[in-house]
């Protein structure tokens, strides 16, 4: 399953929509909830400075759209 993680690059400033970034994780889990928990743990362990805003499971249609926009790249820690 592919998860899109929305985050701010620092926890020092208040979150602003304009500075929200995203990364994509490919996580092999049995449930959506387990995937969200695993995604949060991976990001917090590898990028503790990131302020995670939201974690979204991408449907097939959303995944296709993300690939078409050119911003899609799986992050590996």
Swiss-Prot record:
Enzyme class, UniProt record, top EC level: transferase
Keyword rRNA processing carried by entry: no
GO BP terms: DNA-templated transcription
Gene3D superfamilies recorded: RNAP, epsilon subunit-like
Gene Ontology cellular-component terms listed: DNA-directed RNA polymerase complex
EC number(s) per entry: 2.7.7.6
Keyword Transferase carried by entry: yes
Keywords, sorted A to Z: DNA-directed RNA polymerase, Nucleotidyltransferase, Transcription, Transferase
Reactions catalysed, as given in the entry: RNA(n) + a ribonucleoside 5'-triphosphate = RNA(n+1) + diphosphate
Similarity remark: Belongs to the RNA polymerase subunit epsilon family.
Subunit: RNAP is composed of a core of 2 alpha, a beta and a beta' subunit. The core is associated with a delta subunit, and at least one of epsilon or omega. When a sigma factor is associated with the core the holoenzyme is formed, which can initiate transcription.
Biological role: A non-essential component of RNA polymerase (RNAP).
NCBIfam families: PRK13667.1
Protein name per Swiss-Prot or TrEMBL: DNA-directed RNA polymerase subunit epsilon
Species: Streptococcus pneumoniae (strain Hungary19A-6)
Gene transcribed to yield this protein: rpoY
């Amino acid at each position: 399953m592919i998860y899109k993680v929305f985050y701010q690059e620092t926890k020092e400033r208040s979150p602003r929509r304009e500075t929200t970034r995203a990364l994509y994780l490919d996580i092999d889990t049995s449930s959506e909830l387990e995937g969200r928990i695993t995604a949060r743990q991976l990001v917090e362990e590898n990028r503790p400075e990131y302020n995670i805003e939201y974690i979204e499971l991408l449907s097939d249609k959303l995944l296709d759209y993300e690939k078409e926009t050119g911003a899609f790249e799986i992050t590996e820690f």
